[in-house]
Amino acid sequence: DTPRRVRAFLNSTAREVKFFASCKYEVWPELMKQLSESKIPSFVFATHFTPKSSPLKNSLPGRFLLRAWSRFDMIFTQDESSSSLLKLKGLNSVVAGDPRADRVLSISKHSRAPEDLKAWKGDANLVLAGSSWFQEEGALASVVWTENRKLMIAPHEIHSENIDRILSLFPQATRYSSKSFETNIIVIDSIGLLSSLYSLADIAVVGGGYGKGIHNVLEPAAFGVPMITGPKINRFREAVLLKQHSALHTAATPLALTKKLKALLAPDNTQQLKRSGDAALSFVTDQTGSAEKISSYLP
């Protein structure tokens, strides 16, 4: 985001660029400055602000970032509270919701899980660890997995060292690439499958909640899958709302996650799981329409 690089980029594309669009927090001050000077319309969508958001802080870095945000022709927020906070700083915005809801619902309707994994699951209850890290995997290693209760792990990192580490936690597990299905635990060691795998899951353990923050919870929600995560969800509006709707459960520690998962898998909790899954899907469905609203403002 330097003056020379931004200038070179715009000079190479200026005749073709009709507008610039960014998502959530992707804002580059120098780029915004030169877009404004070049009269190229700019938009940012799916933004979410809290009083602690960096551009809203009364500090030198905060004022610098706020200046960059002020150069957008239109800011689309996810909710009223974000727009209210921006208004206090003199910035106008439009509440448009989160266009990711449209995308994940479309994915849920068109994606298909591999047939061999569907056959492997059969009628068992399947727990899918999506974008997992070592904390979630350690918690899952304390659960007994059987023919009727199976585990699929799709780790955030799939390099060979990490896959080997996971296999050492679950000696009975096999890699998906081995095509060996005589096991109750499969570790996904290829990319691009996670979205479709949620169609098989009865419960999703979404990773990241014990680190910098959880990974995508809208994808499992779009498939009507109840979720368990670590506690770090507050930066993610959709996760907070899913928890309020009882579609997402948090566990303060990996040990608590193990206990929570065992409780949810208990035979007398079938209806609670169904209600959580239904609440997840209803939440995503209620968020749709954002993409159409945003596109109506674009040149």
Regions found by a protein language model. Name each.
Residues 105-177:
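Conserved catalytic-core segment of nucleotide-activated headgroup transferases in glycan assembly
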Residues 31, 136, 193, 213-217, ...:
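Conserved sugar-transfer catalytic core signal across GT-A, GT-B, and GT-C glycosyltransferases
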